[in-house]
Amino acid sequence: MVLEYMDNTKNDHYFLDKIKTDIAFIVDHMKGVDAQELNDNEILLDSMLFRMIQISENAKKLSADCMEKTSELPWNELIGFRNRIVHDYGNVDLSIVFETLKYDIPVLLSQLVDIDSGME
């Protein structure tokens, strides 16, 4: 039925699931990785940055209602991070990237799991 696809709740769950999948990928692949390894491993770095871009792109597709209900999450920072990666790739501070991937992203995953279970 056409109306099912217009249901923002389903769309929000879909995009939140995609965001959680990308975050879980980052958490899994950053285990045991230090800043030097991330800096030296171009494939790993590109993969992590691609996932961050995807997280941001999907965050931008969340409804205003969902963003408001989850306003404690750093949506604007995620979107800004994406813009920095995409538009100023050569000047991205890898120490900030590492800190974000290693320490901030796992916390975000935990928050999303808690929020998503509360939305059901």
Residue ranges of model-derived segments:
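Solvent-exposed interaction patches of small proteins and small membrane subunits
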Residues: 1-120
